[in-house]
């Protein structure tokens, strides 16, 4: 008696003994319970997410203003806007107790060294919002005594346009900063410094909403929006 040995291929079609198609049946309820009660990932990601959640919801702003945009910024601390909803209402009188600075107004060259010194005294990690056209690019003051943008000597995280920006615009910039902080990956120790820090790329809002603005047909005044 002779035998022929052949290798079995489970995926190959078998004309003599046809097999039905294989389908994987999943239990959605079981999968939901597994993902709800069992974490499948790195513990480092959980710890980083918890730290970023605490950082973005407990920003300590430094009470510092330069010009008329500062009036609009302080308006955001009043009851109609209630910046306390975002955990950033505790204004600090000393830069050593703050981790968040808003450059609101015109930055003159004489003020630049003072602002930089205050920034260096702030706690790590720290963030900066440039509020208003003058802080962003010098505004209408294209003269020798005005710095043409605070990003010439400070790292800026969020730019808020306007002359001056409304309090709602400042709150939107604060929310964008919180979103960016939530995606950061940085060492958990403040002693390490800026090395090994990953910040998510933040595209301009005018680019993200370009199609939405073009599609608008009914124009309304700012008071009606």
UniProtKB/Swiss-Prot annotation:
Positions contributing to [4Fe-4S] cluster binding: 68-69, 134, 163
Protein name: NADH-quinone oxidoreductase subunit B
Gene Ontology cellular component annotations, sorted alphabetically: plasma membrane; respiratory chain complex I
GO MF terms held by the record: 4 iron, 4 sulfur cluster binding; iron ion binding; NADH dehydrogenase (ubiquinone) activity; NADH:ubiquinone reductase (non-electrogenic) activity; quinone binding
Organism phylogeny: Bacteria, Pseudomonadati, Pseudomonadota, Gammaproteobacteria, Pseudomonadales
Organism encoding this protein: Pseudomonas putida (strain W619)
Keyword set, alphabetical order: 4Fe-4S, Cell inner membrane, Cell membrane, Iron, Iron-sulfur, Membrane, Metal-binding, NAD, Quinone, Translocase, Transport, Ubiquinone
Keyword Chloroplast set for record: no
Cofactor(s) required for function per UniProt: [4Fe-4S] cluster
Function: NDH-1 shuttles electrons from NADH, via FMN and iron-sulfur (Fe-S) centers, to quinones in the respiratory chain. The immediate electron acceptor for the enzyme in this species is believed to be ubiquinone. Couples the redox reaction to proton translocation (for every two electrons transferred, four hydrogen ions are translocated across the cytoplasmic membrane), and thus conserves the redox energy in a proton gradient.
Cofactor binding, note field: Binds 1 [4Fe-4S] cluster.
